[in-house]
Amino acid sequence: MAVDYSKAVKCALFCQEVYRNFSTVVFDGLVETPVLISEDSTDTQCAILPENSGITIVFRGSDSSFDWQTNFEFKQERAEFEQQIIQQQIVAQQEQVYPYQQKSSSGALMHRGFVNAYFSIRDQIHEYVSNHEIASVTTTGHSLGGALATLCAVDIQYNFHNKVSIEAYTFGAPKVGNDGFRESFNRRVPNSYRFVYGMDIVAELPRWWQGYRHVDAELRIGSRFSLNFLSARFKDHAIDKYIHLLKTMVG
């Protein structure tokens, strides 16, 4: 599998930039004006970045009010992270749905919370792709944004495969669906690159015993060993960690 690490760095930087004040975010190196999409009811945001004959759709990650640079050595801060980010946004909910129809024979099931968030901005994404002459779409996101980028990739392929090619670059993304979804995604989006840094805890969620499976292709970067095991699992989720190491890999 040939991986474009330069593009991975570019996508990771976009993921970092989209965490800034969303209404005024400026993406470095972008010539054309980005299209910003935001839905307050689900606190879901993405930016469509046009470049040449393609677009990159960058999904904003988990709770923007949370400081990813927090020193997780402190138990109270670690507990706050777990409550706000994991319990409320990532741990599997009881109900799951398939995105294209209520009852499907495919067996593909997906996390309801992720689907609801994506569907709240899906129409605007579809409208843009439908109304513009584009040849390729890249979806990207960090953390929760990675889950939404995964959903968007398979959705765009399903609905616009005759118009565009699709790639996905995600960083520290949680699992999105079950085996049925995994098989469908891998078949539809073969150019998918799921980066996991070190001991990133979010990439392990939701748990396998809840029926969730990761999509391909996993790309492990960074060390999976630390003397401070618990702290490292949270620190390794920061997008800055991904960017720093990917830059060293590009040289």
Annotate each predicted stretch with a short phrase.
Residues 1-140, 144-251:
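Non-catalytic, mobile gating and regulatory segments of ester bond hydrolases
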